[in-house]
Amino acid sequence: MSDRQVRGVLGTKLGMTQLWDADNRIVPVTVVKVEPNVVTQIRTTTVDGYEAVQLATTAIAQRKATKPAAGHFEKAGVAPRRHLVELRTTDAADYSLGQEVTAEAFATGATVDVVGTTKGKGFAGVMKRHGFHGVGASHGAHRNHRKPGSIGGCATPGRVFKGMRMAGRMGAARQTTQNLTVQAVDAEKGLLLITGAIPGPRGGLVLVKSASKARVKEA
């Protein structure tokens, strides 16, 4: 259960650029477009056992919403939305159904975590997927250069251990990048400029929220 106030918005990754900071240094930033999020549900300790606020974004046609979803949005008094997210926060009672949350939820200099789905790479070998060194290029290596090597002895252990790093589908997984800084906020255009790279492709959905492990600056 959350014991702190958490701010968050759903947005779309537009791409990367760079800008000058206050110390005249070039800083790479990712631009996130934040369409107004609306509050569609408020969870309380009395009813749900915890406090949280549910946000939704990207309006869709009424005919595209399932009956349960349409009823849910109708109860909140808003048009159906494509994406929803729930944030556990101690100040959920301060929100109201239908309230809009914009990029102004964050101020310049705020520390945030960004959650997104990484780019899918398809089926990848162990060198690309896990960074294996591979087998030698010479000294008798015969068509084994990119193979993983032994994954378990014949008699001992006589099996492959769970979690063995092997080839397989790479990417397209939920990932959180922590402790990024909001370099600038353009409230008029609904843009957040966040230091560094964030997960996902251009046009991908991301969740920007208050950092859970923000570094405390020593005096």
UniProtKB/Swiss-Prot annotation:
Pfam families: Ribosomal_L3 (PF00297). The gene is rplC. This is Large ribosomal subunit protein uL3. Keywords: Ribonucleoprotein, Ribosomal protein, RNA-binding, rRNA-binding. It comes from the Bacteria. GO terms for cellular component: cytosolic large ribosomal subunit. One of its GO terms (molecular function) is structural constituent of ribosome. GO terms for biological process: translation. PANTHER family: 50S RIBOSOMAL PROTEIN L3 (PTHR11229), LARGE RIBOSOMAL SUBUNIT PROTEIN UL3C (PTHR11229:SF16). One of the primary rRNA binding proteins, it binds directly near the 3'-end of the 23S rRNA, where it nucleates assembly of the 50S subunit. Belongs to the universal ribosomal protein uL3 family. The keyword Coiled coil does not apply. Signal peptide: none annotated. Residues 136-156 are annotated as: Disordered. Part of the 50S ribosomal subunit. Forms a cluster with proteins L14 and L19. The keyword Ribosomal protein applies.
